[in-house]
Amino acid sequence: MDEQAGPGVFFSNNHPGAGGAKGLGPLAEAAAAGDGAAAAGAARAQYSLPGILHFLQHEWARFEVERAQWEVERAELQAQIAFLQGERKGQENLKKDLVRRIKMLEYALKQERAKYHKLKYGTELNQGDMKPPSYDSDEGNETEVQPQQNSQLMWKQGRQLLRQYLQEVGYTDTILDVKSKRVRALLGFSSDVTDREDDKNQDSVVNGTEAEVKETAMIAKSELTDSASVLDNFKFLESAAADFSDEDEDDDVDGREKSVIDTSTIVRKKALPDSGEDRDTKEALKEFDFLVTSEEGDNESRSAGDGTDWEKEDQCLMPEAWNVDQGVITKLKEQYKKERKGKKGVKRPNRSKLQDMLANLRDVDELPSLQPSVGSPSRPSSSRLPEHEINRADEVEALTFPPSSGKSFIMGADEALESELGLGELAGLTVANEADSLTYDIANNKDALRKTWNPKFTLRSHFDGIRALAFHPIEPVLITASEDHTLKMWNLQKTAPAKKSTSLDVEPIYTFRAHKGPVLCVVMSSNGEQCYSGGTDGLIQGWNTTNPNIDPYDSYDPSVLRGPLLGHTDAVWGLAYSAAHQRLLSCSADGTLRLWNTTEVAPALSVFNDTKELGIPASVDLVSSDPSHMVASFSKGYTSIFNMETQQRILTLESNVDTTANSSCQINRVISHPTLPISITAHEDRHIKFYDNNTGKLIHSMVAHLEAVTSLAVDPNGLYLMSGSHDCSIRLWNLESKTCIQEFTAHRKKFEESIHDVAFHPSKCYIASAGADALAKVFV
């Protein structure tokens, strides 16, 4: 029966509990089979199809979220990279622009120096090949310059580290001794002729010419005496110290080529200025000029030979070839040595003092170096310096101090500066020199200590051009009159941060509204409690000024408006207030000037020019030197002085105008000097003229602007005049010298008009300007 058993039998035999269930009945076997099926179903429930789908959906959603976060992060990083790249590009552009500016300024400075030298000495200043700066090559070589800069930086750091090591072990003194010995060998104090000539040949190969070696040898033989050798030792120690100076940037850049620098050039560059500064030295050296002259003829034949042969020929053939008495030369040399010793008793200091001197020299600013071409004209060798040596002056200075540094040990820095050969006034030449076109010298002018005015506030609330402005006599308060039919009052101490800049803006604290047309003029009383305005409506409105600290949003106060002064039938162009009599002067397009009593609203006290004999008045002012007089300008070009008490015209100022008036002779403004009997007029033909009130004669006339002069103002002390013009400029003038001491552009043009009015504050440090661009600007 076992062969025909079903699958359950085999499964039961394989089960661990099959033996126990085998002897049981059918019920037990059914129960056991049911338990096995339940266990298998529980195991399969963990991986059901809905569960798997849910898991996949959950993982997909998490993956999508992470990918979205990654995309956002990548976008942020890309934006940051783009921002940094843009910032880097902007910095590079800024650097290029600054480099171009530096090159431009360097080129301009070289031109100015050459021009100054030509004017002073009448000769061209040899500055090498001076070409205008080129910018295209800089951009092309930018990629090549960066690796060089990195290598130069590493080279400089390595030199700095090596310098510290040498200083720690005390090797600096050894270098000084070795170099001093080498200099003595080069200058002919050593008996090793072969080594000396080898050095000269090596120097000549570096320089590309052999004539310089002979020239240096001749100069050294004729000039170096005992005291001169002491000074040369000083100079050599200076050059050694310059090797270890942090200030020598050129030496760091060209450090790899330092070993092949032309030492003969160093000796010659130092010997020439020192030997050329003493008159006795020049006279003594003139005795040896024939040596140099004879040597010039042999340059060509000697250039192909060996350096050692030259020296031997010089030593052997000197007496025969030149036919000179050697005793005379020896006598001259001894005499020259005695004179030098008598003049300069220089004792060589010990090493510690010398090191202190060198340390002090590092703290002092480097003295200006001399071009070899500026040397004494009596020295033939000075004019025979090769051109490429002059061009390499900066490169040579990487190993040396300036030519006069040896004298600075003895004379001091200031005296050494004054004794620079041929330098003269060039010692004071700086980049800050003013242009030659200026007609005045600021340095010698007593205005050098004057105040410089700078813009402080921009008043922006008007909707049309501002025609006039007036300061409060005491408070920092300004009133402006505009073509938008309003006047506005500004407290210059109540500032608020501007919206789009770091500057401060001022908001108006009160707006005066009563005019029915553009307001053309405004004036304040002497105590600042009232102000008066005139406009195209022919009315003169009187106002009570409000408290400067008033809230701009307070309710309307009807007591501010005092009422109009009626009488004019056309636009009122100008007003002037008399503090002595509390009177108000006005001039109108109806051709009349009127005098008003400001204490009451009544008809005018007096009327002037009612017949329009002089034309239409354009401006009026009180004569400060005589309170009973007033001065007025007219459209026909006349300026007259009137007596307000007698109502008579007492004087007409001198004017060269035709009877047929035209726009070119129009006078836009007349003012009176606060302390002197002088009247000043601003003309349409760009002139400013000064008149004597006593005689009516013209004192001075000058073209002050590029376009019509529209406004004038004199400071309370009577020292400076301010003028405004339609050329958009404000100019400040010294009344004593009649020269412009400051100019600034304040406004933009509108309908070919720019600046309408300017004013000084009577007691505080403010000036203001009114423009056709609806802006008023305040300067401090």
Curated annotation (Swiss-Prot):
GO terms for cellular component: bicellular tight junction; cytosol; dendrite; dendritic spine; FAR/SIN/STRIPAK complex; membrane; neuronal cell body; postsynaptic density. The keyword Protein transport does not apply. It is found in: Cytoplasm; Membrane; Cell projection, Dendritic spine. Residues 53-120 form a coiled coil. GO terms for biological process: bicellular tight junction assembly; dendrite development; locomotory behavior; negative regulation of cell population proliferation; regulation of signal transduction; Wnt signaling pathway. Residues 299-310 have a biased composition (Basic and acidic residues). It is a peripheral membrane protein. Its main location: cytoplasm. Residues 124-150, 289-310, 365-387 are annotated as: Disordered. Keywords: Calmodulin-binding, Cell projection, Coiled coil, Cytoplasm, Membrane, Phosphoprotein, Repeat, Synapse, WD repeat. InterPro entries: G-protein_beta_WD-40_rep, Striatin_N, WD40/YVTN_repeat-like_dom_sf, WD40_repeat_CS, WD40_repeat_dom_sf, WD40_rpt, WD_repeat_striatin. WD repeats lie at residues 461-500, 514-553, 567-606, 662-701, 704-743, 750-780. The modification Phosphothreonine is found at residue 225. Preferentially expressed in brain. It comes from the Eukaryota. Residues 149-166 are annotated as: Calmodulin-binding. GO terms for molecular function: armadillo repeat domain binding; calmodulin binding; nuclear estrogen receptor binding; protein phosphatase 2A binding; protein-containing complex binding. Residues 55-63 are annotated as: Caveolin-binding. The modification Phosphoserine is found at residues 137, 227, 229, 245, 259. The keyword Phosphoprotein applies. It holds the Pfam family Striatin. SMART domains: WD40 (SM00320). Calmodulin-binding scaffolding protein which is the center of the striatin-interacting phosphatase and kinase (STRIPAK) complexes. STRIPAK complexes have critical roles in protein (de)phosphorylation and are regulators of multiple signaling pathways including Hippo, MAPK, nuclear receptor and cytoskeleton remodeling. Different types of STRIPAK complexes are involved in a variety of biological processes such as cell growth, differentiation, apoptosis, metabolism and immune regulation. Belongs to the WD repeat striatin family. Part of the core of STRIPAK complexes composed of PP2A catalytic and scaffolding subunits, the striatins (PP2A regulatory subunits), the striatin-associated proteins MOB4, STRIP1 and STRIP2, PDCD10 and members of the STE20 kinases, such as STK24 and STK26. Interacts with CTTNBP2; this interaction may regulate dendritic spine distribution of STRN. Activation of glutamate receptors weakens the interaction with CTTNBP2. This is Striatin. It comes from Homo sapiens (Human).
